[in-house]
C-alpha cells in the first residue's frame, strides 16, 4: 500500500486494551498530529492568566509534560523534537515557558 489516508479517532491513545508503556517515535508523531488543534482558537495557558492564540496544526505542551506522557526522559523528548525540526516536520515557539509545536503541512495529515 503506497498512499491514501486512514481515519483514526483521537481517543485511540486512551483505549484500555493497550498497555501503558513508553511510546515509540512513530507513536509520538501520530500522537502529536492527533493532539494538534484542528482549528485556530484562543486558549488560556494552564495555571496562568495568560491568554494566547493557538493555530490549526499546533499543540501546546511543556517538555516535562511530553516526557511524562511518552514515558521518556526529557532529554530524549528534546532530541526527538529537534530531529523533527531539522527534518522540517515541525517547528516550535515558546510562550511563557510553554512550547507550541506546529505540525508543518498539517493539512496533509
What does each of the following model-derived ranges do?
Residues 1-34:
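Long, low-complexity, charged/polar intrinsically disordered regions in eukaryotic proteins
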Residues 5, 9-10, 40, 56, ...:
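Generic secondary-structure boundary/loop-capping signal
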Residues 8-10, 14, 45-47, 105:
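Generic structural "secondary-structure junction" signal
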Residues 18-19, 36-102:
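Winged helix-turn-helix DNA-binding recognition segment
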Residues 69, 107-109:
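Short, amphipathic alpha-helical interaction segments positioned at domain boundaries
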Amino acid at each position: 500500500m503506497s498512499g491514501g489516508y486512514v481515519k483514526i479517532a483521537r481517543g485511540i491513545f486512551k483505549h484500555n486494551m493497550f498497555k501503558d508503556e513508553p511510546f515509540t517515535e512513530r507513536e509520538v508523531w501520530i500522537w502529536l498530529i492527533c493532539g494538534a488543534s484542528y482549528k485556530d482558537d484562543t486558549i488560556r495557558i494552564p495555571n496562568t492568566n495568560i491568554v494566547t492564540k493557538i493555530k490549526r496544526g499546533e499543540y501546546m505542551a511543556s517538555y516535562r509534560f511530553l516526557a511524562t506522557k511518552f514515558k521518556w526522559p526529557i532529554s530524549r523528548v528534546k532530541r526527538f523534537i529537534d530531529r523533527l525540526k531539522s527534518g522540517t516536520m515541525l517547528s516550535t515557539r515558546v510562550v511563557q515557558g510553554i512550547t507550541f509545536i506546529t505540525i508543518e503541512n498539517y493539512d496533509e495529515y
